[in-house]
């Protein structure tokens, strides 16, 4: 069993924030927070924007964030 690193723990906490809130402002802020983790956060953001309960605006913001991370991680 591996010990989770700090990034994984933080990503889990931010994802929990999104799942426990239906507020688009909170969800968008959480995606922005995830973006600070760079590449490791892409899967988390993809999972979040794949939820049926997420608004179209948040999904669009998530897709833009993933694009930004990919373009700036090289």
Regions found by a protein language model. Give the residues of each.
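Short inter-helical turns and helix N-cap capping residues of alpha-solenoid HEAT/ARM repeat scaffolds
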Residues: 22-23, 53-55
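Core helices of alpha-solenoid repeat scaffolds
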Residues: 7-11, 42
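Buried hydrophobic core positions in alpha-solenoid tandem helical repeats
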Residues: 13-15, 45-48
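Structural detector for internal amphipathic alpha-helices that build alpha-solenoid repeat scaffolds
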Residues: 1-5, 16, 25-39, 57-74
């Amino acid at each position: 069993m591996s010990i989770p690193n700090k990034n994984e723990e933080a990503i889990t906490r931010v994802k929990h924030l999104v799942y426990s809130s239906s507020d688009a402002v909170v969800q968008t802020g959480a995606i922005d927070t995830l973006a600070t983790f760079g590449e490791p956060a892409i899967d988390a953001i993809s999972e979040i924007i794949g939820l049926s309960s997420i608004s179209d605006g948040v999904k669009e913001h998530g897709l833009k964030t993933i694009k930004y991370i990919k373009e700036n991680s090289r």
